[in-house]
C-alpha cells in the first residue's frame, strides 16, 4: 500500500517542498494526489511568493483594504494576472473612443481614474475614465496645448503661444502665466517634492523654475536644435533634441551630467525611470540606454516613420508613431508583442500606460482607450 509521506511532514515543510517544485503544471496536478496535497497546493503561502516571483517588480496594492483582500486569495490573483499577461501577448484588446476636442490632441496624462488631454483647439479637457465624459475644461492658452502635467493640486501646461500656465487643478483657475521662452513650449515636467518645474522649447533651451515663487532660476543652453522632450526623475533631467542628442542634467546646479549619442536623426520623445532612458527618434528607432554608463543596450526597430511618443513600465515599452501604429515591446527582450495597426486615422502624438490599459491621442482628434483587461476579474486587487 502506498505511503503518503506528506501526511507525516510538518505543514510548513510541505509548503517549502511545493515552492521548490516551482513548476506550475506540476503544482496544479497536486490536488489530484490527496486531500493533504490539495490543501498545500492551494495555500496562499504557495501562491503569494509565486506571484511576487513571477511579477517581482510589482508595487504594493494601493490601499490596506486591497492588501487584505489580496492576501486572502493569491491563487485567484495569480490566475487573473496570468490572463492579463496572456491578453498582452496575444493582443486581446477592446478599444473605446473619446471624442470632444475640436482639433488634434497633442498630449495626455492618465491616472487610472481621469484622462487629461491637451489640444490644438487651445483647451485642456479632463475626462472621467469610467464614463468617458468631459467633467472639466481648462481655457486660457492662445495656441495649441502641446504638453501638460498635473497632480491633485496643480496642473501645468505649455503651449505654442510660448507661455506656461500654472492652474489650480480642482477649480480650473489660472494661477499664473510664465513668459520666458521665445518660441513654443514643447514639454513640461514638475516635481512638487523638490519644488521645481522644468520646461523645454523650440527656442533650444531648457528652463528651471521654482514651483513656489514661479520665478525662472536658470536656463540650460546646450542643445543646438529644438528641445522636443524632457523627463524629470528625482533631481535628474533628461532632454531630447532635434540635434540627435540626449542630455542628462542635474536640476540643482544645471550642470551637464552625460550625453547619450546614437540616434541618426532628431529625437521626438524620451522617458526616464532613474536607471533607464528610452528614446524615440525620426530615424524610426527606439533606443534603450543605461543612464549610469551612457551605453545603448538595445535598439528597437519596426516603426516605419518618426517615433513621436513612448512610455514604459517594468515589463513593457509602448510607442506611437507617424506610421499610424502603436507598438508594445517586451522591455526585457526587446521583442515586439503587440502591433496596433491603423490605431488612428492620422499621426499618433501621445501614449500613456497604466496597468492593463494604453491611452492614445492623435492628430485625428480622437483619444482611444486600449483595454487589455478583457475577461480579467478582481482587477482592483492586481498588483502592477
What kind of feature is each model-predicted range?
Residues 93-96, 133-136, 173-176, 215-218, ...:
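A structural motif specific to WD40 beta-propellers
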Residues 349-384:
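Blade-level signature of beta-propeller repeat domains, shared across WD40, Kelch, NHL, RCC1
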Residues 108, 124-128, 148, 164-168, ...:
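WD40-repeat beta-propellers
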Residues 54, 98-105, 139-145, 179-185, ...:
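WD40/WD-repeat beta-propeller blade N-cap
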Residues 118-121, 158-161, 200-203, 240-243, ...:
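Conserved strand-to-loop turn within each blade of WD40 beta-propeller repeats
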Residues 110-112, 150-152, 192-193, 232-234, ...:
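Residue-level detector of Asp-centered blade-edge/turn motifs that repeat once per structural unit
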Residues 1-7, 19, 24-125, 371-384:
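Intrinsically disordered, low-complexity acidic/Ser/Thr/Pro-rich linker and tail segments
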